Amino acid sequence: MNLFRRLQFDLWYLGSPPWDSGITPPEVFEFIQSHPAGRALDIGCGTGTNVITLAKAGWQVTGFDFASRAIQIAKRKIKRANVQAELFTDDATRMKNVSGQFELTLDIGCFHGVPNKVDYLTQLDRVLAPGGFWLMYGFLAQTSDPTAPRIDSADLSRISAQGLTLLSQRNGFDKRERPSAWFFYQKSKKK
C-alpha cells in the first residue's frame, strides 16, 4: 500500500470509520460454531473486534492491518477483553510479519480494496494451510471506476486458479445499498 493510502486510513481511525461497527458478523459466528478451533489470521483486522471474538472461542489468533492507528486501538481492546492475540502492522500484499499457516483466514473488507490482488493471493496461498478456509467479505463490481473497492469476475477467476474452491457465496447489500457478498473458500488439501 502506498504511503498516502496508509495515512488516509490512519486518519480515519482518529474517529470512527464507517466500516468499524464493533460487531462481529453472523457469518463469523456460524463458522466458529461449525469448525474446531485452530489458528486464525484476520487480514485487515482493524480495531480487533473479530480477533477478540475468535480468541474468546478458543482460536489462536493473529491479526494485522496496514493502519498503525487501528492496531494501537486493537491492542488496547484486546487487553481490556483479557484475551491473547498477536497483532502488528503489515501489508496484505507482503505479509512480512506473518509466519506459519492458518486453518482460517478472515478478510472483511480488505481484498476488495487491494490494488495488487495477485500479490495478496500469493501471500494467502503461503499462509493458508492445506484444507484451510478463507472467509471473505467484499463489495462486488458495480462501477467502471478502477479505483473503487470491488471484487470482479477477473478476481474470482484468479482465486479459483489459486487452488481455492468456492463453498458458498451469499450476495447482499451493505447499509448504503452497495452490492456485496460473503465468500467461503477452502484450499485444496494437496498442494
Task: Give the positions of each predicted feature.
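Conserved SAM/SAH-binding beta-strand->alpha-helix loop
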Residues: A67-R69
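A short glycine-rich, Lys/Arg-flanked "PGG" loop and its adjoining helix->strand segment in the class I
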Residues: D119-P130
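Conserved SAM-binding loop
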Residues: A74-K75
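Conserved beta-strand signature within the Rossmann-like core of class I S-adenosyl-L-methionine
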Residues: G131-F139
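Conserved SAM-binding strand-loop segment of SAM-dependent methyltransferases
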Residues: A81-T93
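A conserved beta-strand element that flanks and buttresses the S-adenosyl-L-methionine
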Residues: L106
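Conserved class I S-adenosyl-L-methionine
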Residues: M1-H35, A37-G46
